Amino acid sequence: MNRVRMARAGFVAVLWSVLLCLAGGCASTAMAPADSPATVDAVTLNLWHDKQDWPRRQDAIVADLRARGPDVILLQEVLQDAALPNQAQVLASRLGYQYRFFSADAPTQARRYGNAILVRGTIEASREVKLAPLDDYRNAGWVRTTVDGRPLNVYVTHLHHTPEGGAIRAEQIAGVLTLIGETAGDAPSIIGGDFNARSDMPDLAPLRARFAEAYSDAHPGVDANAPVHATLNPHLGHAPVRIDHVFAQRDAFRVVDADIILDQPDATGAWPSDHYGVWVRLMHSDVPRR
Protein backbone atom coordinates (compact mmCIF):
# COMPACT_ATOMS: atom_id res chain seq x y z
CA MET A 1 0.00 0.00 0.00
CA ASN A 2 2.82 2.40 0.85
CA ARG A 3 4.40 1.66 -2.52
CA VAL A 4 1.13 2.48 -4.28
CA ARG A 5 0.85 5.76 -2.43
CA MET A 6 4.46 6.58 -3.27
CA ALA A 7 3.87 5.81 -6.94
CA ARG A 8 0.73 7.98 -6.96
CA ALA A 9 2.63 10.78 -5.24
CA GLY A 10 5.38 10.57 -7.84
CA PHE A 11 2.86 10.65 -10.66
CA VAL A 12 1.11 13.68 -9.15
CA ALA A 13 4.44 15.50 -8.79
CA VAL A 14 5.29 14.88 -12.44
CA LEU A 15 1.78 15.92 -13.52
CA TRP A 16 2.02 19.16 -11.56
CA SER A 17 5.42 19.87 -13.15
CA VAL A 18 3.97 19.42 -16.61
CA LEU A 19 0.94 21.61 -15.85
CA LEU A 20 3.09 24.36 -14.35
CA CYS A 21 5.37 24.23 -17.36
CA LEU A 22 2.43 24.61 -19.72
CA ALA A 23 0.89 27.41 -17.70
CA GLY A 24 4.00 29.39 -16.93
CA GLY A 25 6.05 28.64 -19.99
CA CYS A 26 9.10 26.42 -19.99
CA ALA A 27 12.48 27.84 -20.91
CA SER A 28 12.56 28.22 -24.67
CA THR A 29 15.50 28.10 -27.02
CA ALA A 30 15.26 31.87 -27.39
CA MET A 31 16.11 32.36 -23.72
CA ALA A 32 19.64 32.35 -22.36
CA PRO A 33 20.43 29.00 -20.69
CA ALA A 34 20.89 29.00 -16.95
CA ASP A 35 24.62 28.39 -17.26
CA SER A 36 25.13 30.97 -20.02
CA PRO A 37 28.29 32.99 -19.45
CA ALA A 38 26.44 36.17 -20.51
CA THR A 39 29.65 37.53 -22.00
CA VAL A 40 30.40 39.10 -25.35
CA ASP A 41 33.87 38.88 -26.89
CA ALA A 42 34.59 41.44 -29.61
CA VAL A 43 37.58 42.27 -31.79
CA THR A 44 38.21 45.34 -33.90
CA LEU A 45 40.93 45.45 -36.56
CA ASN A 46 41.91 47.78 -39.37
CA LEU A 47 42.87 45.38 -42.18
CA TRP A 48 45.16 47.79 -44.11
CA HIS A 49 43.31 46.70 -47.29
CA ASP A 50 45.64 44.74 -49.64
CA LYS A 51 48.95 46.34 -48.68
CA GLN A 52 52.10 44.22 -48.60
CA ASP A 53 51.54 40.46 -48.69
CA TRP A 54 47.78 40.11 -48.05
CA PRO A 55 47.67 36.30 -48.38
CA ARG A 56 50.38 35.95 -45.73
CA ARG A 57 48.76 38.56 -43.49
CA GLN A 58 45.41 36.88 -43.97
CA ASP A 59 46.76 33.59 -42.65
CA ALA A 60 48.11 35.27 -39.51
CA ILE A 61 44.83 37.08 -38.88
CA VAL A 62 42.75 33.93 -39.38
CA ALA A 63 44.98 31.89 -37.06
CA ASP A 64 44.67 34.45 -34.26
CA LEU A 65 40.92 34.98 -34.62
CA ARG A 66 40.21 31.27 -34.91
CA ALA A 67 42.08 30.65 -31.65
CA ARG A 68 40.14 33.40 -29.85
CA GLY A 69 36.71 32.69 -31.32
CA PRO A 70 35.20 36.13 -30.65
CA ASP A 71 31.46 36.58 -30.91
CA VAL A 72 31.82 39.61 -33.20
CA ILE A 73 34.61 40.99 -35.37
CA LEU A 74 34.67 44.59 -36.59
CA LEU A 75 36.82 45.34 -39.63
CA GLN A 76 37.91 48.56 -41.31
CA GLU A 77 39.77 49.27 -44.57
CA VAL A 78 38.13 46.25 -46.16
CA LEU A 79 38.68 46.09 -49.91
CA GLN A 80 37.27 44.23 -52.87
CA ASP A 81 38.34 44.62 -56.49
CA ALA A 82 38.12 42.82 -59.80
CA ALA A 83 41.13 40.68 -58.89
CA LEU A 84 40.61 40.73 -55.11
CA PRO A 85 37.70 38.90 -53.46
CA ASN A 86 36.06 40.89 -50.68
CA GLN A 87 38.41 40.57 -47.72
CA ALA A 88 35.62 40.36 -45.14
CA GLN A 89 33.89 37.64 -47.14
CA VAL A 90 37.13 35.64 -47.32
CA LEU A 91 37.78 35.93 -43.58
CA ALA A 92 34.16 35.09 -42.74
CA SER A 93 34.28 32.02 -44.97
CA ARG A 94 37.50 30.76 -43.43
CA LEU A 95 36.26 31.36 -39.88
CA GLY A 96 32.71 30.08 -40.40
CA TYR A 97 31.10 33.45 -39.57
CA GLN A 98 28.34 35.45 -41.21
CA TYR A 99 29.25 38.95 -42.42
CA ARG A 100 27.97 42.25 -43.75
CA PHE A 101 30.10 44.64 -45.79
CA PHE A 102 29.37 48.38 -45.72
CA SER A 103 30.75 50.79 -48.32
CA ALA A 104 30.18 54.34 -49.49
CA ASP A 105 31.07 53.13 -52.99
CA ALA A 106 28.28 52.21 -55.37
CA PRO A 107 27.37 48.50 -55.40
CA THR A 108 27.98 48.47 -59.15
CA GLN A 109 31.64 49.40 -58.77
CA ALA A 110 34.22 46.64 -59.05
CA ARG A 111 36.46 48.35 -56.51
CA ARG A 112 34.70 48.95 -53.20
CA TYR A 113 36.24 50.00 -49.89
CA GLY A 114 34.62 50.05 -46.47
CA ASN A 115 33.92 48.36 -43.17
CA ALA A 116 32.48 45.00 -42.16
CA ILE A 117 30.94 43.12 -39.25
CA LEU A 118 31.42 39.39 -38.80
CA VAL A 119 29.35 37.42 -36.27
CA ARG A 120 29.68 33.86 -35.01
CA GLY A 121 25.90 33.57 -34.87
CA THR A 122 23.20 34.71 -37.27
CA ILE A 123 22.74 38.19 -38.72
CA GLU A 124 19.09 39.02 -38.14
CA ALA A 125 19.03 42.57 -39.55
CA SER A 126 21.49 45.11 -40.93
CA ARG A 127 21.74 48.67 -42.16
CA GLU A 128 24.36 51.19 -43.22
CA VAL A 129 24.52 54.97 -43.45
CA LYS A 130 26.90 57.37 -45.13
CA LEU A 131 28.47 59.88 -42.76
CA ALA A 132 28.88 63.60 -43.44
CA PRO A 133 30.62 65.14 -45.22
CA LEU A 134 29.84 62.82 -48.09
CA ASP A 135 33.09 63.64 -49.89
CA ASP A 136 34.96 62.01 -46.99
CA TYR A 137 33.52 58.61 -48.04
CA ARG A 138 32.91 57.39 -44.49
CA ASN A 139 30.09 55.18 -43.26
CA ALA A 140 28.74 53.28 -40.30
CA GLY A 141 27.20 49.82 -40.32
CA TRP A 142 24.86 47.94 -37.98
CA VAL A 143 23.83 44.34 -37.51
CA ARG A 144 21.51 42.71 -35.00
CA THR A 145 22.58 39.29 -33.77
CA THR A 146 22.11 37.02 -30.77
CA VAL A 147 24.89 35.94 -28.42
CA ASP A 148 24.14 33.25 -25.82
CA GLY A 149 20.43 33.80 -26.27
CA ARG A 150 20.64 37.57 -25.79
CA PRO A 151 20.01 40.12 -28.56
CA LEU A 152 22.92 42.40 -29.42
CA ASN A 153 23.36 45.46 -31.63
CA VAL A 154 26.80 45.74 -33.22
CA TYR A 155 28.06 48.89 -34.97
CA VAL A 156 31.25 49.57 -36.90
CA THR A 157 32.75 52.78 -38.26
CA HIS A 158 35.96 54.40 -39.51
CA LEU A 159 36.17 58.14 -38.93
CA HIS A 160 37.97 61.03 -40.63
CA HIS A 161 41.75 60.76 -40.38
CA THR A 162 43.40 64.19 -40.22
CA PRO A 163 44.66 65.43 -36.82
CA GLU A 164 42.97 68.79 -37.36
CA GLY A 165 39.67 67.18 -38.35
CA GLY A 166 38.09 67.01 -34.91
CA ALA A 167 34.99 68.90 -36.01
CA ILE A 168 34.48 66.46 -38.88
CA ARG A 169 34.83 63.47 -36.55
CA ALA A 170 32.34 65.06 -34.15
CA GLU A 171 29.84 65.41 -37.00
CA GLN A 172 30.42 61.79 -37.96
CA ILE A 173 29.92 60.64 -34.36
CA ALA A 174 26.58 62.46 -34.42
CA GLY A 175 25.67 60.41 -37.50
CA VAL A 176 26.67 57.19 -35.77
CA LEU A 177 24.56 58.07 -32.72
CA THR A 178 21.60 58.80 -34.98
CA LEU A 179 21.98 55.34 -36.53
CA ILE A 180 22.07 53.80 -33.06
CA GLY A 181 18.95 55.70 -32.04
CA GLU A 182 17.09 54.46 -35.11
CA THR A 183 18.09 50.80 -34.87
CA ALA A 184 18.98 49.79 -31.30
CA GLY A 185 15.51 49.30 -29.87
CA ASP A 186 15.64 47.64 -26.45
CA ALA A 187 18.74 45.53 -27.19
CA PRO A 188 22.16 46.53 -25.80
CA SER A 189 24.78 47.93 -28.14
CA ILE A 190 28.51 47.92 -28.77
CA ILE A 191 30.39 49.99 -31.33
CA GLY A 192 33.95 49.64 -32.52
CA GLY A 193 36.32 50.65 -35.23
CA ASP A 194 39.10 53.00 -36.23
CA PHE A 195 38.15 56.37 -34.75
CA ASN A 196 41.38 58.11 -35.81
CA ALA A 197 41.41 59.76 -32.39
CA ARG A 198 42.28 58.89 -28.83
CA SER A 199 39.25 57.87 -26.83
CA ASP A 200 39.59 60.87 -24.50
CA MET A 201 39.45 63.48 -27.28
CA PRO A 202 36.59 66.01 -27.37
CA ASP A 203 35.50 64.62 -30.77
CA LEU A 204 34.25 61.46 -29.06
CA ALA A 205 32.68 63.06 -25.97
CA PRO A 206 29.05 62.49 -27.08
CA LEU A 207 29.82 58.80 -27.56
CA ARG A 208 31.56 58.51 -24.17
CA ALA A 209 28.48 59.95 -22.48
CA ARG A 210 26.57 56.73 -23.21
CA PHE A 211 29.30 54.21 -23.99
CA ALA A 212 32.31 53.10 -21.99
CA GLU A 213 35.60 52.71 -23.84
CA ALA A 214 36.47 49.13 -22.98
CA TYR A 215 40.26 49.15 -23.09
CA SER A 216 40.58 52.10 -20.69
CA ASP A 217 38.02 50.58 -18.33
CA ALA A 218 39.91 47.28 -18.31
CA HIS A 219 43.15 49.00 -17.29
CA PRO A 220 42.28 51.38 -14.44
CA GLY A 221 45.09 53.28 -12.81
CA VAL A 222 47.32 53.28 -15.90
CA ASP A 223 47.70 55.71 -18.77
CA ALA A 224 45.89 53.70 -21.43
CA ASN A 225 47.00 56.26 -24.02
CA ALA A 226 50.71 55.74 -23.35
CA PRO A 227 52.72 54.49 -26.37
CA VAL A 228 52.91 50.98 -24.91
CA HIS A 229 49.13 50.70 -25.46
CA ALA A 230 49.20 52.02 -29.04
CA THR A 231 47.18 50.41 -31.81
CA LEU A 232 49.01 52.15 -34.65
CA ASN A 233 51.98 49.94 -35.53
CA PRO A 234 55.21 51.92 -34.94
CA HIS A 235 57.21 49.29 -36.83
CA LEU A 236 55.46 50.37 -40.03
CA GLY A 237 56.11 54.08 -39.73
CA HIS A 238 53.24 55.21 -37.49
CA ALA A 239 53.40 57.27 -34.35
CA PRO A 240 52.40 55.00 -31.43
CA VAL A 241 48.85 56.17 -30.70
CA ARG A 242 45.76 54.21 -29.61
CA ILE A 243 42.99 55.10 -32.05
CA ASP A 244 41.15 51.77 -32.42
CA HIS A 245 38.42 51.30 -29.83
CA VAL A 246 35.45 49.24 -28.71
CA PHE A 247 32.73 51.08 -26.80
CA ALA A 248 30.09 49.30 -24.73
CA GLN A 249 26.72 50.65 -23.61
CA ARG A 250 27.25 51.83 -20.03
CA ASP A 251 23.92 50.68 -18.60
CA ALA A 252 24.09 47.26 -20.28
CA PHE A 253 27.66 45.99 -19.88
CA ARG A 254 30.64 46.01 -17.62
CA VAL A 255 34.13 45.43 -18.96
CA VAL A 256 35.80 42.18 -17.90
CA ASP A 257 39.06 42.40 -19.84
CA ALA A 258 40.71 43.93 -22.90
CA ASP A 259 43.99 43.45 -24.71
CA ILE A 260 46.00 44.54 -27.71
CA ILE A 261 46.28 41.66 -30.19
CA LEU A 262 47.86 40.88 -33.55
CA ASP A 263 50.85 42.93 -32.44
CA GLN A 264 53.65 40.55 -33.39
CA PRO A 265 55.25 39.72 -36.77
CA ASP A 266 55.38 36.21 -38.15
CA ALA A 267 58.59 34.23 -38.60
CA THR A 268 59.39 36.11 -41.82
CA GLY A 269 58.94 39.52 -40.18
CA ALA A 270 55.56 40.23 -41.80
CA TRP A 271 53.04 42.10 -39.63
CA PRO A 272 49.31 41.26 -39.67
CA SER A 273 48.45 44.92 -40.35
CA ASP A 274 49.68 48.46 -39.86
CA HIS A 275 47.22 48.57 -36.94
CA TYR A 276 47.12 46.22 -33.99
CA GLY A 277 43.79 44.70 -33.09
CA VAL A 278 41.82 45.20 -29.89
CA TRP A 279 40.08 42.32 -28.12
CA VAL A 280 37.54 42.95 -25.35
CA ARG A 281 35.37 40.81 -23.11
CA LEU A 282 32.14 42.32 -21.83
CA MET A 283 29.62 40.96 -19.36
CA HIS A 284 25.97 41.89 -19.22
CA SER A 285 25.52 44.16 -16.22
CA ASP A 286 22.51 42.20 -14.93
CA VAL A 287 24.81 39.27 -14.11
CA PRO A 288 25.94 39.40 -10.44
CA ARG A 289 29.63 39.91 -9.80
CA ARG A 290 31.44 36.88 -8.47
Describe the predicted segments one by one.
Residues N2-L15:
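Bacterial N-terminal signal peptides that target proteins for export
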Residues R8-F11, L22-R94, P107-R111, R281, ...:
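N-terminal, active-site-proximal structural segment of metallo-dependent hydrolase catalytic domains
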Residues A30, G181-I190, A197-R290:
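Metal-dependent phosphoester-hydrolase catalytic domains
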Residues V40-L47, I61-L84, L118, V143, ...:
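Active-site beta-strand/loop signature of hydrolases that rely on acidic residues for catalysis
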Residues D53-R56, K130, E164-R169, A270:
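Short, solvent-exposed loop/turn segments at secondary-structure boundaries
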Residues W54, V72, Q76-L159, V256-I261:
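Structured beta-strand-rich core segments of catalytic domains in phosphoester-bond hydrolases
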Residues R56, A60, D64, N86, ...:
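Extracytoplasmic/secreted proteins, especially bacterial periplasmic and envelope-associated proteins
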Residues Q87-S93, R111, E171-G175, E182, ...:
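Preference for well-ordered, secondary-structure-rich cores of eukaryotic proteins
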